[in-house]
Structure formats: structure tokens, C-alpha cells
């Protein structure tokens, strides 16, 4: 769908975030921490954060996600100086109605609720009423001689609470209005000057609970570019996380209950991490890494999604165009391997899942090796999908301008190459390296294009099937130290080593690796036989490619290329 995230590393990040929220719901500690989404620009942090908020909005509109709050009513009937405009007052912090009960009664009610719900976590609530609600409760209890039931029956209405970012209700996205002059009232609320003349400055009714933490109560606080805030301003987050309280101006501490999410990029993270004065803040954050995609086919899916959502006329994207653009992106994000037996492109292919049983490539070891070289992990640096997506868009417009109805890999490569140095986020000292990576991608594309031509010209299903069966007959005889029947004479003979090697050499398998490959395909055939499936070389990518290349070598001298042109 349109809200899909691509790539193993991104799904690991999402899984980690969900686990932290779940453990927080069980009171295991993460509820007292900021969930800090850390990643390079364009890695999907903001999109993920936005989708969390949209999901929460949707969830509170469903039966299983129902939330309730309360409002005070008929206040002017009891409180003489109550402003008629404030006869009905909604809970300014959208608190749960259960906080209206004294703790002993509340605990009994919550115990009954937990038994009925049979939820995988236990509901708890030890919060105090916010100052304004506490004021109303005290006044009303005094009027009714401490009869709480009369207060609840005559002055409380229970209302549904729907999370709504546009209304700043149970969801708040925070970005300071002025990054040079940040005011804590943006977080915790401020005096309502229009009410001071009515109630007086120290009256809790004259306070405006419109701070970001107030609006986010019972929901999600999302801090945009959180670590760009001034150090002093971030101190407000210390109590908001560890103690789950806020301290507005001229007010006592107020209890809050919300998931606090922050987003930041690498430069700000390094700056704050190295600041000794930020030690307390850093201790209250749980970092969740949001790196770039490291599988080039998953990267290509991002570009396909972009094109699918664009207002474009029918334009044919040639084979390998988006995959090779994705490969370039991945090459800029991964570390050069230490193994002499594997190069950077092969490592990218391994990360893409293009390895076989006989390949001497340990993907887990490659990841661990890279982790020792970089500060956090692979994918935290490199070219962003935004840059590549922009260049694909430019290449499309260039093709349309030239009256071409297709987008080719070569046009895309040219746009990437011509605009590398114009992109502000790419360090100058990486230009030459990235140009080299583009050349590697061009070579990879050339090999794939040649392979496509071979496949098209040598494509003969019957012959590939026949050659595949012959290869497997000789392989099984080789493994079992047996003989095979000669196709012409019918006599038993030794396996044809020359024929076997003529197939295997098309995959550039050295002599010392042939046994591994033969055992691999033999295991594959045996596994399919047990599952009741017939042998078809088309279902084994490496065997198919080897047979196609051999067939190409056998037939290419008989192809009339002039006639094809």
C-alpha cells in the first residue's frame, strides 16, 4: 500500500519502536523515556512518525480504541464568581474520568476494569487532577458537604475523546516558533490574560492549558528536530519523561501520560551526545536508528511508489533503471568489505539476498564487520532516496522534453553524475568516490543488459530443459560415483566432466568450488522431489543462467546479427 516501508533495517526499527511502546504500557521503564528516531535526512523518520499519529487517530475512533474524558457542567449554579462563558468547562488536560475518584475507590474500580478487559497489560492510574479541575472539585465538594456522588451526578458529563492532530487533541506536533528565543510556555502553557481580570492572576481558572505537553496528554507528543532545541529548553523534558509531570508557570506539578517521540539527524545527535551538560537528557532517551535502505531492490520500490503517485503520462521505464539507481544509493551507504573474496557490488548483492548455499559469503559477518567501522551502523550516511528520486524525476522530464516515451538507465546515470556536485548534502570529499561507484553501477548494468540479450536470443525452453536434465544426470552419477547412459550408444559411461564444467564455468565457478555447486543443485532437486514437484531448471536461477549462457555460446556463431538489426 501507500503506507508501506521497505527494507529489513526499517522493519527492524519499526519493530523496536513497537516493543518500546508495549513494554512502556506494562510499566517496564520505556514509558519514562523519549523515543528518539535517529537517522540521516530522507530515511523515513518523519513519514513513520506521521503514520503513527494517523494510526492513533484512527484507533481512537474504533470501538477497541475508545477513550473518554469529562467536562464540568452547571458551574455557575454553585460558584458565584464563575464566568458565565465558563459554565461548562472541558477537562483542560483531557484526563481520564477515573481521576475524579479518590485513590482508594479508584483502585477498586480499576481492579474491576482489569478483570473485565483481560488485556495483556494492567491499567494503572495514580494521577492527580489538574489544578483547574482540582479547584472545581474542592468548590463543589464544599457545596455538597463532601458528597462526591452529588458532584458527579450534577456537574460531570463523560465525553468521548478522539485523538485529532488538527484540533491539537491527544496529539501534538511540536516545533518551536523561534529557535533562538524559545519559551517554555510553548510546552507547558501560559497565563490566560483575558481571564486575569475576572479571576485574578493566581487563580487556576486563569491559566491556559495550551502547551504542547498539555495538548498531547493521553496521546502522542511528536518533537520535530528535537535536538535542535536549546539545551535549557530541553530540561523541561527531564520531568516530563522521568517523573511524567510538567511544571507550568505559577502552577504545581501536573501529571501527564503520553508517548514522547523525537526526531533528529546525525549532526545534532553527535553535538548533544558529546555535551556533558546533556548527560541527564541523554540518559532519558531510547534511540531507535532509522537508516537508509540497504537492499537495492527495496530501494527501487521506493522510486516505483514515487512514480505511481506522480501525475505522469504513460512513460516506459526500461528494465534495470530503478534497480541500478537503487544500487548506486546502496553503494554509497555500505562499508567496503574486508574480505578480498568479495567486492562492494557483491556485498550489495548479498544484502539484496542474492546468495546461494555454495557462496562463501556470510551476510551476518559482513554486517558485524561493518558495525565495527562506523559510529552507529551502516545506512546512516550516503546518498538519500530524495536525491536519487529527484534525479529520476529530472531524467523523466528530460526524456519527455526530447519526445522520448521511455526512461533509460543511461539517462538516469547521466543525471546522477551531472548533479552530484550540486547537491548540498553530499560532502565534497566524497565526490570522487561516488563517481567511482557510478562506474561500478554502469558496469553492472552492462553485464545485465548482455545477459538480457543472451536470454532473448538463446531462449529455448525445450533445449534448456534437455540440457538441464543431462546436467543433473551427470551430477547425480558424479556424486554417487556411478555411471550414466550414453545418449547415442546407450552404453554406460563415466560422468562427462567436460560437459559439467562447460556449464559451471558460465557461472565462473573455479575448480575447487564445483563440488559445492553440484551438491547444492542435487539437494535442490531432491528437496523438490520430496515435495512432489518435477525438475525444471527455470526454477533455479543460477542453474538457469548457466544453461542459458552455455546455450548462447553454442548458438551464437549461427546467429545472423545483421538480420536481427
Model-derived segments and spans:
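Conserved ASCE/P-loop NTPase catalytic core
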Residues: 1-565
